[in-house]
């Protein structure tokens, strides 16, 4: 499926501030909506709501986009191949957005361990028909106290992971935290291999 015949201007929204707390989200969703209006008015063709940890946050963001008629993607951050960071099953998230959100052009996962992605893709596919986009971390763990990444990268090569994601049904594949140029090259090789097999 080709989503765009031309180059898109994509606006990414992943805010790390006092605005994004469970308390504000629960008590003042209108405040969050107001903040997002400026992003839509800035001229992006599509808005990417990324690293979304909560289903409620995703629903607020979707409501804003639908209200103003803007196309958008939603990408969740996940703790395992079953749940997003707040603990909601990814299957429930996919079911929530399966119908009634005509401007939602892609749903997916980012800022998540590479080894969880294939399982997450399958669970999303089982519960909705929206194209899936994934861009995981390269595999290291983040120490929030020391603010450093540590540990080894994932067992498989990023190229093999990317290929597996494509085989599983992902329409878009990329990289998030600790991915660099070589990871992009690996995704390109995976895409070439996958495309050759589709001929």
Model regions: which residues?
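Domain-level signal for soluble alpha/beta catalytic cores
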Residues: 1-199
């Amino acid at each position: 499926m080709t989503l765009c015949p031309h180059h898109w201007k994509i606006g990414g929204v992943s805010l790390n501030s006092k605005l994004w707390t469970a308390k504000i989200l629960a008590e003042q969703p209108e405040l969050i909506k107001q903040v997002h209006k400026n992003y839509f008015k800035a001229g992006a063709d599509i808005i990417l709501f990324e690293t979304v940890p909560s289903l409620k946050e995703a629903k607020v963001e979707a409501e804003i986009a639908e209200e103003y008629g803007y196309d958008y993607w939603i990408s969740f951050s996940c703790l395992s191949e079953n749940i997003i960071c707040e603990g909601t099953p990814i299957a429930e998230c996919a079911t929530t957005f399966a119908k009634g959100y005509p401007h939602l052009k892609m749903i997916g996962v980012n800022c998540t361990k590479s080894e969880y992605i294939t399982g997450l893709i399958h669970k999303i596919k089982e519960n909705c028909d929206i194209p899936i986009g994934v861009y995981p971390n390269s595999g290291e763990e983040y120490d929030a106290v020391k603010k450093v990444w540590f540990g080894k990268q994932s067992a498989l090569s990023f190229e093999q992971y990317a290929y597996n994601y494509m085989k599983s049904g992902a329409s878009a594949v990329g990289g998030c935290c600790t991915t660099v140029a070589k990871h992009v090259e690996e995704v390109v090789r995976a895409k070439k291999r996958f495309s050759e097999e589709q001929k």
